[in-house]
Amino acid sequence: MTDLPDSTRWQLWIVAFGFFMQSLDTTIVNTALPSMAQSLGESPLHMHMVIVSYVLTVAVMLPASGWLADKVGVRNIFFTAIVLFTLGSLFCALSGTLNELLLARALQGVGGAMMVPVGRLTVMKIVPREQYMAAMTFVTLPGQVGPLLGPALGGLLVEYASWHWIFLINIPVGIIGAIATLMLMPNYTMQTRRFDLSGFLLLAVGMAVLTLALDGSKGTGLSPLTIDGLVAVGVVALVLYLLHARNNNRALFSLKLFRTRTFSLGLAGSFAGRIGSGMLPFMTPVFLQIGLGFSPFHAGLMMIPMVLGSMGMKRIVVQVVNRFGYRRVLVATTLGLSLVTLLFMTTALLGWYYVLPFVLFLQGMVNSTRFSSMNTLTLKDLPDNLASSGNSLLSMIMQLSMSIGVTIAGLLLGLFGSQHVSVDSGTTQTVFMYTWLSMAFIIALPAFIFARVPNDTHQNVAISRRKRSAQ
């Protein structure tokens, strides 16, 4: 990348800062949830919605981000994304109630949904094709550093300042990023096809109301009759989308995607798999603080080994999959993650705290292997004309399943615990033990899906080539 013009390198730095802001925010909040609950006068069992409101908004808005960038221009949309994210951060810090915080997090989510995919699109437009991989590696590196710093930084700010600062630190970075975007980034546009607004609205309504209904009457405060109504609305919306997308070449996501077996299995496995693994970043710091009495900073530091394990494993995932094949790797890592989850719970409740960093490092390795394998399995056999649509659908499903996972984790805590959980409660560790056991069971379930993946990797490649040549 040294032969790129200075202006292009500056533009890559802007995209990298956007990736860093978005990735930092996904992890920095987790260690602050108990302190937020105390400050806002809420039960810690309700604080999972702080994460859900952000991740669910990202899932809902993702399908529109690429079309908006092509229509309005990458500079305009990237600038808007940074402004919305920064304003959302300010409103989060100013929130005095949980409902205000949830609305502010949703605004953050709108910005976050546009920031990363539009950033990728920007790199694609400003960098020569032969240097695209090197450029993407450069801009995504800060996105890997964000999760590494987030938990510890969040714990440090909460312990020595207040939870408001985990949002306030975004403001100066956002202002600098917005100004730099206007000054340095070109406003590339492309000819766009008509946006499938009907399909977008049907999917958005279906995802939002079903996730809200899943939280139950205790979590939302809604009556059982209203919850039943939300479920009915969500199911009807999704069925209407399927009818809308059938034989519709302009559908948001073509149903032709599901003719590729590995895509169908990979997407189903990714959805189910990320529901389980999506619980872990939320539950781990909450358990360490409320269940074991760790300080916010100590709990944040304990999350670093998990991120290091994840980053370290990415270098050898390809060799592992090539050696053992997708089916064996995915089944083994799914069951392995369930066992590691049980191991974490056992060592924590036994008081073997010195073992926890090693267990969390192992958890990060297993989880990273499974994530990378799921992603490549899902997309590897798609024909070229469906690859972009399939990637967008996978990105949306990833965010949606994580929001559902956090919702289920909060629901399990509510089922097993009292309305208010404190460190002094004699039942607290029992509540968390039952929750972790349930999580381990949920994490193991996708193994049944992955067991149906064709076993031989080379055979899969040969089949995919015949499919591509036949279309």
From Swiss-Prot:
One of its GO terms (molecular function) is transmembrane transporter activity. Residues 33-48, 98-101, 159-164, 218-224, 284-285, 363-395, 452-471 are cytoplasmic. Its main location: membrane. PROSITE patterns: MFS. This is Putative multidrug resistance protein MdtD. It is a multi-pass membrane protein. Gene3D superfamilies: MFS general substrate transporter like domains, Multidrug resistance protein D. The chain crosses the membrane at residues 12-32, 49-69, 77-97, 102-124, 138-158, 165-185, 197-217, 225-245, 263-283, 286-306, 342-362, 396-416, 431-451. It comes from the Bacteria. Residues 1-11, 70-76, 125-137, 186-196, 246-262, 307-341, 417-430 are periplasmic. It is found in: Cell inner membrane. InterPro entries: EmrB-like, MFS, MFS_dom, MFS_trans_sf, Multi-R_MdtD. Belongs to the major facilitator superfamily. TCR/Tet family. One of its GO terms (cellular component) is plasma membrane. Keywords: Cell inner membrane, Cell membrane, Membrane, Transmembrane, Transmembrane helix, Transport.
